[in-house]
Amino acid sequence: MDTRTEKRKESMKKKKQLIFMLFFLIILFIVGYIILPRIRIKIEQEKCDKIYANKILKLPDKEKNNVGFTCTGLYWDKEEEYFFIGNAGKYKPNDKTFQASIEIVEKDFSIIKGDIPCYLKFENMRDIQGVTKSTDGTIWLCSYGENKVRHIDEKGNEIGYFDIKEPSGIANDSRSNTLWILTNNYLYNCSYDGVVQKTIKIHIKGQDQLFLDEKNDLIYFSAGADYHGDSYIYTVDLKTNRAKPLYVLKDSYAIEGITIVDDVLYVLNDGYYHDAETPINQVNMYFLNKMQTKENYQ
């Protein structure tokens, strides 16, 4: 065997070794970057409190009897003592028209006190997601279908808007007069004119609605979207920017709004729209100082 043949064989051997090493590194990257975080999340979810609603209320009816409405966003106005609830504006996905509005609802969810018919002001609005109010009484809402956050007064008149991709959850931060906005991939802190001041990368399947706990510097957000399995409540520590699961909600299958009032976690479900495991538009109430676990659930 001549020297050139030996060199070629040696070169081929090194190339094969290099290809093997690259393939091995790619596998390590996939395991480290994709699989291990999912395993960690699954382990964290298993450690969470698994809770059931202490009380469940049907949403009040609007146009149709015994259906409620398609709830999409929840805000408690402690000054007025009413809930502001987004209404996607149609009962089923195949309905032809959207009539998105904000419903003003009694604390016990018995009746709708009034509404803000946003669809009359904004022709291109296809739905509403999150809803919140700032300290001056004006309203902010996520118009997911338009990729906008809209700012309106209590009569629905436009004050302004800014563009943001796929906004779903929103909360006003009265400490800084800014907004926290959850999208499919990020949690943003924005000024009222839409300038992003802080970005936190978050990508949990089905992340959607949020609530800000100013006292403890925590964001709560909902996740999970298969409509027949568990849903989750996560927290984000705004000091460390770390997200972690807090509760597994065993009986909320179509979450479309969350808030905490007097140690009660209110969770809106639009199960009728999604044909969920519980196909009812309702609010599930979880008493955080008397949590209902699987062992004592009736």
Model-identified regions with their sequence ranges:
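Blade-level signature of beta-propeller repeat domains, shared across WD40, Kelch, NHL, RCC1
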Residues: 256-298
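Short loop/turn segments that connect beta-strands within beta-propeller blades
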Residues: 106-110, 152-157, 191-195, 237-241, ...
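Surface loop/turn motifs at the tips and blade-to-blade linkers of beta-strand repeat domains
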Residues: 57-67, 116-124, 161-165, 200-205, ...
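Beta-strand-rich domains and repeat architectures in extracellular enzymes and scaffolds
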Residues: 62-98, 126-130
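Repeated scaffold domains used in trafficking and secretory/extracellular systems
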Residues: 68-75, 123-132, 165-174, 204-213, ...
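Conserved beta-strand positions in repeat-built beta-propeller and related beta-rich domains
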Residues: 85-96, 141-145, 179-185, 221-228, ...
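Structural motif
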Residues: 92-103, 147-150, 186-190, 228-234, ...
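Short coil/turn segments that connect the beta-strands within blades of beta-propeller domains
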Residues: 79-81, 136-137, 175-177, 215-217, ...
